[in-house]
């Protein structure tokens, strides 16, 4: 039985992970749950899974949870704060760490798990894209293992040779028969909109993804397609791929989650219904497979699978992220930071949808930082960029 730590248990990835545990109670035991401030959902999760530890980032939420658990005579120990999260991410007893905290908040806990030599199921792409070389060096310096659980990267992982699977980020793709990686994108809810019409879309419309059930932040990232740009960066790092070895195609049906083209002309693809439980369950059970609880794909009901190139004019954030990766680690850190600020402002109805890309571009182009060589330097760039971004948004509002 594998013992599991779930970082971000009340988010969409965390909920999907716990659903898989419910379906496979003889295979997994939850020992640590971590969330931000949703004490009500955390209480329900503690009641069902009886973890040894529950950690709330928010101190007030932790206090509420502790009282409610005591009232119900549940013995789960409650802690709060970032330090506790990082400590429990490295817990010796844990076999799998699900890294599903959204945004930069997931960086330090993920690195803590890596430095402890844990097996990490990575959904928090920000940890990788802002720390890049630092992240991969930490990974190679100990026994830690990474399994991607983004649907696209997991799809790529599934159809790569076993040797590449076991040596992510360390091997030459062409020497292992791989010609290219084809990264698919749904295009979000606005792929067939004209850019000028996007200024008027609401947060609710932008969060209404046609295929996937996701959290609010990643839903907006999908709508701007910056998420696919970040996934491009993630694929470059995880699979040691060059820019010429990755292609991006919009595939509105979200049935083919990505493909790998081999040097003999073969293309292997991973297909399933758009449900994150498929990717997560594979990573949890690799190299085996278990019941995910997802519905099965019915080919009799598939009428069309379409593919086309993304329009960089319509989705400038996609091109911005691709270009930022080529500029280096500092640029990726800046872009991630300003994007978290602009997405939050859009969700709060402070700026329009198109302002996300405009402000992201302005802040990235007007920022100049030396390449970070430590996590502390990454965090400093992140902090300064957030302050600058907030000032920019405030100047537009008032």
Swiss-Prot record:
Its cofactor is Mg(2+); Mn(2+). GO terms for molecular function: 1-deoxy-D-xylulose-5-phosphate reductoisomerase activity; manganese ion binding; NADPH binding. NADPH binds at residues 10-13, 37-38, 124, 126, 215. 1-deoxy-D-xylulose 5-phosphate binds at residues 125, 151-152, 186, 209, 222, 227-228, 231. One of its GO terms (biological process) is isopentenyl diphosphate biosynthetic process, methylerythritol 4-phosphate pathway involved in terpenoid biosynthetic process. Disulfide bonds: none annotated. It comes from the Bacteria. Keywords: Isoprene biosynthesis, Manganese, Metal-binding, NADP, Oxidoreductase. Its EC number is 1.1.1.267. It is an enzyme of class 1 (oxidoreductase). The keyword Chaperone does not apply. Mn(2+) binds at residues 150, 152, 231. It catalyses: 2-C-methyl-D-erythritol 4-phosphate + NADP(+) = 1-deoxy-D-xylulose 5-phosphate + NADPH + H(+). SUPFAM superfamilies: 1-deoxy-D-xylulose-5-phosphate reductoisomerase, C-terminal domain, Glyceraldehyde-3-phosphate dehydrogenase-like, C-terminal domain, NAD(P)-binding Rossmann-fold domains. Gene3D superfamilies: 1.10.1740.10, NAD(P)-binding Rossmann-like Domain (3.40.50.720). PANTHER family: 1-DEOXY-D-XYLULOSE 5-PHOSPHATE REDUCTOISOMERASE (PTHR30525), 1-DEOXY-D-XYLULOSE 5-PHOSPHATE REDUCTOISOMERASE, CHLOROPLASTIC (PTHR30525:SF0). HAMAP family: DXP_reductoisom (MF_00183). Catalyzes the NADPH-dependent rearrangement and reduction of 1-deoxy-D-xylulose-5-phosphate (DXP) to 2-C-methyl-D-erythritol 4-phosphate (MEP). Homodimer. Belongs to the DXR family. This is 1-deoxy-D-xylulose 5-phosphate reductoisomerase. The lineage of its organism: Bacteria, Pseudomonadati, Pseudomonadota, Gammaproteobacteria, Enterobacterales.
């Amino acid at each position: 039985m594998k013992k599991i730590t779930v970082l971000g248990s009340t988010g969409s990835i965390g909920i999907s992970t716990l659903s898989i545990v419910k379906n496979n109670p003889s295979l997994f035991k939850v020992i640590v749950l971590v969330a931000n401030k949703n004490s009500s959902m955390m209480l329900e999760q503690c009641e069902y899974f009886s973890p040894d530890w529950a950690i709330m980032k928010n101190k007030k939420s932790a206090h509420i949870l502790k009282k409610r658990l005591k009232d119900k005579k549940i013995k789960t120990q409650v802690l709060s704060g970032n330090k506790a999260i990082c400590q429990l991410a490295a817990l010796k007893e844990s076999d799998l760490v699900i890294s599903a905290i959204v945004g930069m908040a997931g960086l330090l806990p993920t690195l803590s798990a890596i430095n402890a030599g844990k097996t990490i199921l990575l959904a928090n792409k920000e940890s990788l894209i802002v720390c890049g070389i630092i992240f991969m060096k930490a990974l190679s310096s100990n026994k830690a293992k990474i399994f991607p659980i983004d649907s696209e990267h997991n799809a790529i992982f599934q159809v790569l040779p076993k040797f590449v699977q076991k040596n992510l980020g360390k091997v030459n793709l062409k020497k292992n028969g791989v010609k290219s990686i084809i990264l698919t994108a749904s295009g979000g809810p606005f792929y067939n909109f004209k850019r000028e019409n996007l200024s008027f879309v609401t947060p609710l419309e932008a969060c209404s993804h046609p295929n996937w059930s996701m959290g609010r932040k990643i839903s907006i990232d999908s709508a701007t397609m910056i998420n696919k740009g970040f996934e491009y960066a993630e694929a470059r790092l995880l699979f040691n791929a060059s820019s010429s070895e990755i292609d991006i195609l919009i595939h509105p049906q979200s049935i083919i989650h990505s493909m790998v083209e081999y040097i003999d002309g073969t293309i292997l693809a991973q297909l399933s219904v758009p449900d994150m439980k498929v990717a997560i369950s594979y990573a949890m059970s690799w190299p085996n497979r278990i019941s995910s609880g997802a519905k099965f794909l019915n080919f009799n009901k598939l009428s069309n699978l379409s593919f086309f190139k993304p329009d960089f004019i319509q989705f400038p954030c996609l091109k911005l992220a691709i270009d930022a990766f080529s500029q280096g680690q500092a640029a990726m850190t800046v872009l991630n930071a300003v994007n978290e600020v602009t997405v939050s402002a859009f969700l709060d109805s402070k700026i329009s949808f198109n302002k996300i890309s405009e402000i992201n571009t302005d802040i990235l182009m007007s920022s100049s930082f030396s390449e970070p060589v430590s996590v502390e330097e990454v965090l400093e760039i992140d902090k300064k960029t957030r302050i600058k971004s907030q000032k920019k948004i405030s100047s537009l509002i008032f």
